[in-house]
Amino acid sequence: MKPTNEPKKPFFQSPIVLAVLGGILLIFFLRSFNSDGSFSDNFLASSTKNVSYHEIKQLISNNEVENVSIGQTLIKASHKEGNNRVIYIAKRVPDLTLVPLLDEKKINYSGFSESNFFTDMLGWLMPILVILGLWMFMANRMQKNMGGGIFGMGSAKKLINAEKPNVRFNDMAGNEEAKEEVVEIVDFLKYPERYANLGAKIPKGVLLVGPPGTGKTLLAKAVAGEAHVPFFSMGGSSFIEMFVGLGASRVRDLFETAKKQAPSIIFIDEIDAIGKSRAAGGMISGNDEREQTLNQLLAEMDGFGSENAPVIVLAATNRPEILDPALMRPGRFDRQVLVDKPDFNGRVEILKVHIKGVKLANDVNLQEVAKLTAGLAGADLANIINEAALLAGRNNQKEVKQQHLKEAVERGIAGLEKKSRRISPKEKKIVAYHESGHAVISEMTKGSTRVNKVSIIPRGMAALGYTLNTPEENKYLMQKHELIAEIDVLLGGRAAEEVFLEEISTGASNDLERATDIIKGMVSYYGMSSVSGLMVLEKQRNAFLGGGYGSSREFSEKTAEEMDLFIKNLLEERYQHVKQTLSDYREAIEIMVKELFDKEVITGERVREIISEYEAANNLESRLIPLEEQAS
């Protein structure tokens, strides 16, 4: 399908601009006439000169003028010099001697009107015409952006460009299950008669759900690319405008265009922009533009397509829980395909896809990079590869090395290294104790994740240091002891400050907030406390966007007080436990702090080595948690 967008005309070929220029020229032309229809002296003159009234009278007295025209406020005197006629113009002043002087010198004189009907009329009409022209210009621009004319404002044809993507399933790695779910969609589009002969009904819609950056749009393009069918793509927000009824009209145009080129695919990205549930919290939302657009979408999905010329709707969202139930029923979106974050093998495959065209050194180990990036989506991995290439180029390297990839991972997780942010030795010491506390507790707590690196170099917007914990695999479930372990690790920084410096700082504010949220989830959502038992008190907001827990109160004031007391007591209990552990390993932490102060960065291996050496020197039983007992 050829793009329907017409090429823009040059600015000076715009009808409105031409009309304005024509009006200006017309004004100048009409001003050249006198009120009786004859050409004015100004138009016939070769030149005009503005002079004083005294000079005009002097010219008359010296017989240097031939004709004089007297107006209400102006006086004109004409004089012919050879083939040239000169007009002298002056402001008129009350003077009873002027006419006798003209009679005495026998100079022709007459009166003239300083305005005429045409210019007076244009003086009234021009402001109206200018305002009308500007209004038409703005309305025309708005209508073009909306894809329609004055009487076809809702047309979406100019917004729709069919494409045939060259993306294939081989270009998308890390989501094999999702690809398997949509492979038969390709078969439906290629051979619709095979299924029609069997009496099978082709799915009308497939909803792709998952966290941001996991490749939902790429998967939709791959389906169209494999099936070799037209691909119509629009964002959910593209349907909504300020004019009521415009969204519904665009939906009609989109489906009408797709049906003309069937078999084809319609892809609606971020469908939650128009597909949000019409009943929010038990209250019906207003009959607004979004609701009309949704109703039209529901009607179109009920009545379009045939078995021999199918049109399949693919849609993507990371907020499936807010979609309208009518949109999710069978017959509309028959299937939901989860496009989740990749596991270890998936991350390796995604990295292999994105390193194509990147010059890699021999020391690059993609498996190690995949271990460091658990929990990251495909878009994050693509960004890491690109960031590593940029780092290599910035360092004037000819190849991307493993160190560049590791640095890119740290940038993605912890933020940009702030070498220019100078902190005082006192603050540096506080940060060193804080991060050492996190690291030691992480290595000595069952269910926590292994330490990969400890740094006191500022990164990101606010972090003055960080402890990089990298689980080797994504976590889909967490046991109670793992949640407790995470709380202990978060409290380790604050506890180290109090144990070793005997004073606390503001650096643990985010740690305390996260620890509180974990316990709140245990009480109100996971049923892991005596306060709520198995009762769920709050609902999780969004599984894919990490929205935390709902703020709606579905419990009594007494229960709220018990929740607050439970959270406070558990935090205090874990805090005392962490402080005792750090006190037991005081000398090991002092060694760690000294190395951090000198080197600014130490590895996880060095952290474990310091703890092991301290335990061996003091004949202590090892409290280091083996790798197999840590969260993986």
UniProtKB/Swiss-Prot annotation:
GO molecular function: ATP binding; ATP hydrolysis activity; ATP-dependent peptidase activity; metalloendopeptidase activity; zinc ion binding
Periplasmic side stretches: 31-116
E.C. no: 3.4.24.-
Transmembrane feature ranges: 10-30, 117-137
GO cellular component: plasma membrane
Name of the protein: ATP-dependent zinc metalloprotease FtsH
UniProt-annotated location(s): Cell inner membrane
Assembly and interaction partners: Homohexamer.
Secretion signal, residue range per the UniProt entry: none
Family annotation (InterPro entries): AAA+_ATPase, AAA_lid_3, ATP-dep_Zn_Metalloprotease, ATPase_AAA_core, ATPase_AAA_CS, FtsH, P-loop_NTPase, Pept_M41_FtsH_extracell
Membrane topology per record: Multi-pass membrane protein
Active-site residues, record numbering mapped to chain: E435
Main EC class the enzyme belongs to: hydrolase
The UniProt record lists the keyword Transmembrane helix: yes
Membership in a protein family: In the central section; belongs to the AAA ATPase family. In the C-terminal section; belongs to the peptidase M41 family.
Residues where Zn(2+) binds: H434, H438, D511
GO BP field: protein catabolic process; proteolysis
Residues annotated for ATP binding in this entry: G210, P211, P212, G213, T214, G215, K216, T217
Cofactor (UniProt): Zn(2+)
